[in-house]
Amino acid sequence: MFRWITILIVCAATHAPITIASDQSTLAELVERGNVMEISAALQAGKFTSRALTKHYLDRIDRYDEEYRAILAINPNAVNDAIKTDEMRSQGSRAPLLGIPVLIKDNIETRELPTTAGALALRGNRTNRDAPLIAQLRKAGAIILGKTNLSEWANFRSERSSSGWSTVGGQTRNPYDPLRTPCGSSSGSGAAIAARFAPLAIGTETNGSIVCPSHVQGLVGFKPTVGLVSQTHIVPISASQDTAGPMALDVDSA
């Protein structure tokens, strides 16, 4: 059911435990390139820790997201979760996404945060549960970094609704040119990857909502075959067309 995640599986560079202090130069270079496999290999080799990586992304969000409005909420447990993945790695864990921060479109339920679909009507909608997709990401070792902005109700409003605008998050901006569209409805997931707020994000698509933001922001994103990824606990539009899928900077990472 989740076979698309196999594309994200990371080949570890070594089997050595983490013993080296954070190399900020290497970390910054890898964040800029955004390749999930390279980042995972560096984590496995002890070039830096998941804690340092997570804090680096959180610092970027704090510094730049006021302009881009890609992020709706940060997981308050993200740094602690990163520390746990460092401990797991030192104990020999080889989970495929171990210690990789991932951002989640805010129409997908996560236990730590409300799921709003960008709408004021759902602003306090905290269900305290994970969608099966999120449970699979956690099982693979991913760190849920936070939730991303989107076209409100995933654009299930009108043909003239603004791409990337929601009453909760405002207007998402395209980091490459804030005057151009970020497209939608997975606008925040796309803008977040383009701004290097995480190496991997999850969007959803009914008709173009992953591929369009990926296209206009220089990313790779794809819509898996409907039914391959569980639709459970994702705010619905169409049972025959809805699916979640990955968005990243390159083919290897997506």
What are these regions (language model features)?
Residues S22-N207, T225:
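Gly/Ser-rich catalytic/binding loops embedded in alpha/beta enzyme cores
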Residues W4, L58-R60, H233-P236:
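Short, flexible, solvent-exposed loop/turn segments with mixed acidic/basic and small polar residues
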Residues W4-H15:
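Bacterial N-terminal signal peptides
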Residues E159, S163-S166, G190-A254:
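Fold-level recognition of mixed alpha/beta catalytic cores in primary-metabolism enzymes, strongest
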Residues H15, A117-G118, Q217:
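Hydrophobic alpha-helical membrane context
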